[in-house]
Amino acid sequence: MERWPWPSGGAWLLVAARALLQLLRSDLRLGRPLLAALALLAALDWLCQRLLPPPAALVVLAGAGWIALSRLARPPRLPVATRAVLITGCDTGFGKETAKKLDAMGFTVLATVLDLNGPGALELRARCSPRLKLLQMDLTKPEDISRVLEITKAHTASTGLWGLVNNAGLNMVVADVELSPVVTFRECMEVNFFGALELTKGLLPLLRHSRGRIVTVGSPAGDMPYPCLAAYGTSKAAIALLMDTFSCELLPWGIKVSIIQPGCFKTEAVTNVNLWEKRKQLLLANLPRELLQAYGEDYIEHLHGQFLNSLRMALPDLSPVVDAIIDALLAAQPRSRYYTGRGLGLMYFIHHYLPGGLRRRFLQNFFISHLLPRALRPGQPGPVHDTTQDPNPSPTVSAL
């Protein structure tokens, strides 16, 4: 085909005018998505010059630019006005940062913490307005939940409760399922599932009245079978399914439900090396003799080191998660799922589309120990069978 002379400036002028208008209205998301869209438009321009006559090429390029800018538009948000939000787990991490951001935006924030005199609570008192109210709550204690429900009803009597952010979470152990005491599964379920369930059910009358929002911080570990995170992952899978069920059941009431799926971020609870060392020592101290001989103490030490090394990739900037929570609270049409964090798209692509063998190999290299258990190493004797019963005792640790 003979190449047509291509005055592409007309299409680009339309795209630039639309982009400028969106910028003036603060309605354009800047950053890598915008750069990627411009690169794709430039590639499309190059193809149009070679394959299409000018009128058709003008329509295609201008239409593609219009669609791209529409996708990059900031979704319309509801006004903050006098909205009140309850956030759990505000001692550290996502909860604390979200509480500070919502308070700065003008929300009435009810922030639950484990320790009213802890560093997180002290920081919130110092940096936030008098509108923010701190509430002590341990999600493993029904009496704490009941007290918070009563205080919330009284505190929001005039404004109503717009949103609940289920952020509090707990991970007790990083180890193979066989090495993980059953009590660690129960502890994760108490905080990550049953506590969130009881609190959410208790607040539903207020949320039905306001036609508000439920936002829950989940985890990719609830979607994918990460080795050595079974106790944490199963509890997150349970809460995700519960929230999906709520999403269907509460739709007629006008309540919108969202789940935030963050990648690896540098929160205090995740990167507390001393805490993970104590949990490793507790695991070793309570392992039955047979299991310790079959796996070897060096296997557990190596696994612990691999896990800590993986945390070096944790992202220090928590704002992507905080921004996702805020969007779920204020967007006119919030998403049911928000995926935040580096590499999550690739991980989900592998999990959903690659054959099972490749998926398992990928997950096995996530941070799992590459050292074989002692009984599987060449030249090692088989495991010793211990006929004594060991209940795997472990003291209960409250949510962090």
UniProtKB/Swiss-Prot annotation:
Highly expressed in kidney, adrenal gland and distal colon, and at much lower levels in lung, hypothalamus, hippocampus, and midbrain. One of its GO terms (molecular function) is steroid binding. The gene is Hsd11b2. It catalyses: an 11beta-hydroxysteroid + NAD(+) = an 11-oxosteroid + NADH + H(+); corticosterone + NAD(+) = 11-dehydrocorticosterone + NADH + H(+); 11beta,17beta-dihydroxyandrost-4-ene-3-one + NAD(+) = 17beta-hydroxyandrost-4-ene-3,11-dione + NADH + H(+); 11beta-hydroxyandrost-4-ene-3,17-dione + NAD(+) = androst-4-ene-3,11,17-trione + NADH + H(+). Its main location: other. NAD(+) binds at residues 82-111. It is found in: Microsome; Endoplasmic reticulum. Belongs to the short-chain dehydrogenases/reductases (SDR) family. Substrate binds at S219. Keywords: Endoplasmic reticulum, Lipid metabolism, Microsome, NAD, Oxidoreductase, Steroid metabolism. This is 11-beta-hydroxysteroid dehydrogenase type 2. Inhibited by glycyrrhetinic acid. Induced by progesterone, through the Ihh signaling pathway. Signal peptide: none annotated. Interacts with ligand-free cytoplasmic NR3C2. SUPFAM superfamilies: NAD(P)-binding Rossmann-fold domains. Residues 389-400 have a biased composition (Polar residues). Pfam families: adh_short (PF00106). It is an enzyme of class 1 (oxidoreductase). Catalyzes the conversion of biologically active 11beta-hydroxyglucocorticoids (11beta-hydroxysteroid) such as corticosterone, to inactive 11-ketoglucocorticoids (11-oxosteroid) such as 11-dehydrocorticosterone, in the presence of NAD(+). Functions as a dehydrogenase (oxidase), thereby decreasing the concentration of active glucocorticoids, thus protecting the nonselective mineralocorticoid receptor from occupation by glucocorticoids. Plays an important role in maintaining glucocorticoids balance during preimplantation and protects the fetus from excessive maternal corticosterone exposure. InterPro entries: NAD(P)-bd_dom_sf, Sc_DH/Rdtase_CS, SDR_fam. GO terms for cellular component: endoplasmic reticulum; intracellular membrane-bounded organelle. Disruption phenotype: Homozygous knockout pups have reduced Na(+) and water content in the skin at birth, but retain higher levels of Na(+) and water in the skin throughout development and into adulthood at the expense of K(+), manifesting hypokalaemia by 15 days of age and contributing to salt sensitive hypertension. Its EC number is 1.1.1.-.
